[in-house]
Structures are given as structure tokens and as C-alpha cells.
Design a protein with these regions (language model features):
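Short acidic, Pro/Gly- and aromatic-enriched capping/linker segments at domain boundaries
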Residues: 1-3
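Residues immediately within or flanking Cys/His clusters that coordinate Zn2+
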Residues: 180-183
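Catalytic alpha/beta core of large soluble enzyme barrels
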Residues: 5-177, 187-188
Length: 188
């Protein structure tokens, strides 16, 4: 066996395996809507759900927290019942300093036979932000990529949230039946 360990891009595989984390990637959000051929449903971070239950919060309070998180794009940073340490644990992919993602990939690289599919996550500043904020963002993106270039064999995707996004006017989940346009065997 020439290769003993490879890390594939596993977003689809994580869904098939029942909502596990997407391999080496951090979660994009703690709550999000997953759309499939059979409809849409809300996916929640099961570890965060356990923590909220452990805190003894009522079902109504927990549901309000999930709704607030959905409005905040899956972020827990404004959830008052969580400690600062808990907020650190449940940061979304864009809230994590991307240098850490590169550093972790660098540390595990010697144990991986092939190159890793390392994705980086950024949130662009809003168009209304000052020029200095935009300059800092560009410098940060540049610094992370230079750091990655010197530490890793390659980087895979640059994922960014849009500078402008539609208002989240309704977080209610709507079931939509999608047309079966592709072979179901090819979905994985």
C-alpha cells in the first residue's frame, strides 16, 4: 500500500453519515437549512443542543435561542446563556481565525500521505464599512494565504460570505419538493 491515509473533501459524506462534522472542516453554522430532493429541514448542532438541555432551559427558551441563531447565520456569539468559553467552542467557520485552520492542517500533514483539501472561510466587510476595514480584510486574507503557501502543499477552496445578503425575514422552514433530475446513486 503506497498510501495509508488520505483526507477527502467530505461535506457530502458527512450528510450521508447522519450529520457528522465535515471531516477536517469546522461547521459553517450551528443551525442551517438543508435542502434535499425530498424537501428542506433544519439541522442543528447536536452538541450545542445537549449543552442547552444540560443548562436546564425550557423548550420554549431553547427554541427561541435556535431561532435567534438562525437569524444570526448560525452564530452563538450573541446568545447570553453561553459562557465565553462555550462561545469559543461553538464558533462558526468564518468566526475562527483562519491561521488556526492552516496551522492545524500543517500539524497533521506529516501523518497524511496525500495533500489535504483545506478550505478557508472569510466574511467580507459590508459595502458600508470604511476603506480601512476593507484594507484590513484584504490584508488578513493575503496573510492567511501566504502563511498557507509556506505551510501546506495546497489550499482547496476560498469560501466567503457575501458582503450583502438578503434580509432574513422568515426563519420558518418551508418544505419544497425538488425535481429528481439526477441519479440517486450519484448523490454521495
Amino acid at each position: 500500500n503506497a498510501h495509508l491515509l488520505a483526507i477527502a473533501p467530505n461535506a457530502s459524506s458527512s450528510i450521508i453519515c447522519g450529520g457528522t462534522s465535515p471531516s477536517i472542516e469546522p461547521y459553517r453554522a450551528n443551525v442551517y437549512t438543508h435542502k434535499t430532493l425530498s424537501g428542506s429541514y433544519q439541522v442543528r448542532n447536536k452538541y450545542l443542543e445537549k449543552l442547552l438541555k444540560k443548562k436546564g432551559l425550557s423548550m420554549d427558551t431553547r427554541e427561541k435561542i435556535w431561532k435567534d441563531m438562525a437569524i444570526a447565520n448560525g452564530s452563538v456569539q450573541d446568545i447570553e446563556v453561553l459562557s465565553d468559553e462555550e462561545k469559543e467552542v461553538f464558533k462558526t467557520a468564518t468566526e475562527i481565525n483562519q491561521i488556526y485552520i492552516v496551522e492545524h492542517a500543517h500539524m497533521r500533514q506529516e501523518y497524511v500521505c496525500q495533500s489535504q483539501s483545506v478550505n478557508l472561510f472569510f466574511t467580507m466587510p459590508k459595502a458600508t464599512e470604511s476603506q480601512s476595514v476593507h484594507d484590513e480584510y484584504l490584508q488578513y486574507v493575503n496573510d492567511v494565504h501566504w502563511y498557507g503557501m509556506n505551510k501546506l502543499k495546497s489550499l482547496y477552496y476560498f469560501r466567503s460570505d457575501a458582503a450583502r445578503s438578503a434580509e432574513n425575514v422568515n426563519v420558518k422552514i418551508q418544505r419544497v419538493k425538488l425535481e429528481d433530475v439526477e441519479c440517486l446513486s450519484c448523490e454521495g
